[in-house]
Structure formats: C-alpha cells, structure tokens
Amino acid sequence: MKNKLQILIFDSGIGGLYFYSEIRKYIPHANYIYVLDNEGFPYGNKYKNFIFDRVTNIIIYMHNLYKFDLTIVACNTASSIALSYLKKFFISPVIGIKPDINESVNITKNNIIGLLATKITINYVLSNFFNFKSLNKIKLITLDANELIKLSEEKMRGKIIHLNKIKNILKPILLNKNIPDTIILGCTHLLFFYYEFKKIFPIGTKFIDSKKILLNKSIMLISENYIKKNKIKHQTVYYTKNNRYFKKICPLLNKYGFKYLKKIYIYK
C-alpha cells in the first residue's frame, strides 16, 4: 500500500481542470500535479512534430521530478499524437482522452455525427475510424474548434460569452440540411460549453465526451493502491512560460486549489 499517491494531469491549457475537479471527487487524497504548457497553447494550430516534442519532453521532465502513480493526458490533441509513445515509455500507467467514436455510432438515429475538435484530432479520427467499411453509412461533419477553445478559456476566467458568438462559430454545422443528432465534443475545453450547446442544437441532440471513460480508468487503476489520508488542500501547477496568459489564469488556478505555482525550465 502507498502512503502518498501522485497523479500528473497534463494539458496545453486549462481545459484539463474539468477532469481534475471530477477525478478529485472520487480520489480526494492524492497529490495532484497539473502541468500546463501555456507557452505552446493552443495546440490546435501547431504542427504534429512540435506537439509531440513538447508533450513527451515535458512529461518525461516531470517524471524525473516525481514518481507518478498515474499520468493523465487530458488533451485530445496531445493524446492523438503522443499517447502511444508515452504508454510504452513509462512503467506506471498513462491514460489519455480521445473522441468516443463507438458510442456516437451506436446512438445516432439519423447516421449523421458532428465532431468538434482541433484539426489534428479530426485527422486522427478520419484516419483511424472512418476508413472502415462498417462506418460507410455514417456521415461525419467536422468543425475546427480552435475558436471555441479560446472562448472557453475566456469563459473560465469569468468573461461572459454571448450565445450568438458561439452559435456563429457553429454555423457550418447548423446550416446543414440535415443537422447531426449526435455531437462529439473532441476537446476537453468544450465541456465548459455543454449547457450553451444544449441551447443551440435541436432538442434531443446527444453530446458525447470521454470523461466517464477517463474517470473509470483512473479509479480502476489506482483506487486500491494507496492508503486514504486527509484531503490535500493545496495542489501544485507547473507552467512553461510566465506570460500575460499565465497571469490571467492565476486567479482561476487558485480557485481550483492550486496554491503552488512552479515554472518548468525545460525550454528557455
């Protein structure tokens, strides 16, 4: 049995805070290290090699500082590119988040699915799932969610985002003759717009994300491997650049219980 459980949560932005808050409800006694690659944010408009190098280098760097029992890559884009490599590299479990294609295919009634994600995640889905003959009957409508990701960060920092602004970004999907009855939220940031999406899309639209899968995996992997102690009040954030963006999100990080803020010196 372990006296202290160490969990690493990685994201380019603050979208991973959603998973942190959810996982902490079930595993409140762990020491959480949230790693924020704010210098590389957003990943959606970056090249694959750039993302792969940053994700792997940063996570390896963190594993040299701490002995993690679980590493969570709470970013669809990063998971699509680097998760397979990281799983082979570390002995301790590494889990990530990817669009739940199977569930969306199983529940769609009109065989039209919408995917909101970064271009890299969209390409991952197209190359790994929609080249199978069994999915030929499915029509996939995709939308680059980069602007929605930026807006979600503004919302998390307390800014009011008007519904029409979100609706305008979603027009390429909403203006289709047949609107998808199932929408995949292929980015952690989009979970913060769940209620706005419910208002914008037709009644009955199903929204699919991978939070339950990620939570279940986390609980299954570590729930029996440590001694429960008192809940740790203050957690730690590591960031990659002390820029204006980071200063803006500091109050939010503090609100989530991250008192200790430390810079990663892997990049100059």
From Swiss-Prot:
Transmembrane segments: none annotated. GO terms for biological process: cell wall organization; peptidoglycan biosynthetic process; regulation of cell shape. One of its GO terms (molecular function) is glutamate racemase activity. Pathway: Cell wall biogenesis; peptidoglycan biosynthesis. It catalyses: L-glutamate = D-glutamate. Coiled coil: none annotated. The keyword Cell wall biogenesis/degradation applies. PANTHER family: GLUTAMATE RACEMASE. HAMAP family: Glu_racemase. Belongs to the aspartate/glutamate racemases family. This is Glutamate racemase. It comes from Wigglesworthia glossinidia brevipalpis.
